[in-house]
Design a protein with these regions (language model features):
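A common structural junction motif
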Residues: 77-80
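Short S/T/G/P-rich N-terminal loop/turn motif that feeds into the first structured element of a domain
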Residues: 1-55, 64-72, 88-107
Length: 107
């Protein structure tokens, strides 16, 4: 079950992939997931996608400063540029502070 994320900063990355270089994309995505998890303030990630290459990835950070530091990380910036050049047809990003967080689970 999900943790309470009230007060955390959420970065919502909504994208559509080109379908180009799927292996390179998978390698880069795994590397970025691992690198993000090592960053100060990282709190977790959720990801959903469909067969058409559209996806939503939400990364959670302790605060906006942590999210900004991740955006500025040199390896992340390099991979972001590769994504613009090869892997994404488009993307949009939203940053928000979570005002309320709860979950439910069937038992």
């Amino acid at each position: 079950m999900a943790e309470d994320r009230t007060g955390q900063t959420a970065v919502l990355f909504i994208s559509a992939r080109t379908g180009e270089d799927a292996e390179g994309y998978a390698t880069a995505a795994a590397a970025m997931d691992a690198l993000a998890a090592e960053q100060p303030g990282y709190r977790g990630i959720d990801h959903v996608g469909n067969a058409d290459g559209q996806a939503i990835t939400i990364s959670y950070w302790a605060d906006e400063a942590s999210a900004i530091a991740w955006r500025k990380h040199p390896e992340h910036a390099e991979t972001r540029e590769a994504g613009r050049g090869r892997w994404y047809g488009w993307y949009m990003l939203h940053v928000a502070t979570i005002g309320r967080s709860y979950s439910w689970e069937r038992k």
